[in-house]
Amino acid sequence: YTVRQATQGLANYVLSQNGQEKGVAIAYDSRRMSTEFATEAALCLNANGIKTYIFDSLRPTPELSFAVRELHCIAGIVITASHNPREYNGYKVYWEDGAQITPPHDKGIMDEVKAVTDFATVKTMEKEEAKKAGLYEVIGAAIDDAYIAELKKLVVHQDAINQVKDTLKIVYT
């Protein structure tokens, strides 16, 4: 319910900004129900006539920011609770500049979310129907490659990296 309510509010705001053709990029992490929440968000947007670009598997939040700009989307959604305990999940919205929403969009979106008081007004559709309509597009390797290429352009000390690239060990916890 919460994901669909938030997404219907976002959809209403996107429509008020004439952004339905630009679309919304959607990413998610490995937390419980992230994939399902991302799919439900996409289908709600699709039912409102808004194109979505949803990653084929989990991606980091910075890649969502990149995808929003690369695909010229009006907005992006990341299903993640970020630094919070793993049993939680969350819903973050980004605007067309790839950054988290700021005024006036933050207030505009929240006003639309709060206005969704009747669940019967929340739209959704079947995934196959959305795909046939060209509203649900799965993205992956092409965006990954473009993202990594852009990251490589930001490397400041390539010589230092080359010196340790075969011996550097990283532990992720």
Locate the predicted segments by residue.
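Gly/Ser/Thr-enriched, mixed-charge loops and adjacent short helices
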Residues: 1-2, 89-172
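Short secondary-structure boundary/capping elements
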Residues: 2-6, 33, 56-59, 143-146
